[in-house]
Amino acid sequence: MSTALFLHGLDSSTQGTKARWFRQHFPQVQMRDYVGDLSQRLVQLEEQVQGLEKLILVGSSFGGLMATCFAIRYPERCKRLVLLAPALNFGEFQPPLEKITVPTLLIMGRHDTVCPPHLVQPQAEATFSHLQVRIEDDDHMLHASFPVLDWPNLLI
């Protein structure tokens, strides 16, 4: 059985728009509030998923960076990643020496000025060997695109 988790962005929380949407439409999606820097948040995520396998990590912005870093460290524990405007342009992130094979859907907004596709996509292509890319007519928040994604299939 798979476990789906939502990883919120840096300045967001489980009270953010996407988290509230998941609670309303897909209450099985697990989430928690992450605090601190990237390494602290990754420790919190590791504690949260201790003993779990077949993880479906849905990461928004900084949460997408968290999901990517977790998958690089534990690819065998990840079933799928859904990266929503991930912060792969964050200065500390470096793609791994060898691409990981976790199936990954990368969704970006064409008008995103926080995590612009021209900076994020090359990082994703250097990280994942099984990458599907969608560039939507949207901005960083992906408010128009997010609710109409194929969540019933992405979360199984």
Predicted features along the sequence, with ranges:
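Active-site catalytic motif of lipid deacylating hydrolases and related acyltransferases
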Residues: 2-52
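Conserved alpha/beta-hydrolase "acid-adjacent" motif
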Residues: 15, 113-119, 143
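Post-His helix in hydrolase/transferase enzymes
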Residues: 143-156
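Short beta-strand/loop motif that positions the catalytic acidic residue
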Residues: 100, 106-108, 112
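A conserved short beta-strand
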Residues: 76-89
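Catalytic histidine neighborhood in serine/cysteine hydrolases
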Residues: 28, 125-142
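Gly/Ala-rich beta-loop-alpha elbow adjacent to hydrolase catalytic centers
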Residues: 58-67
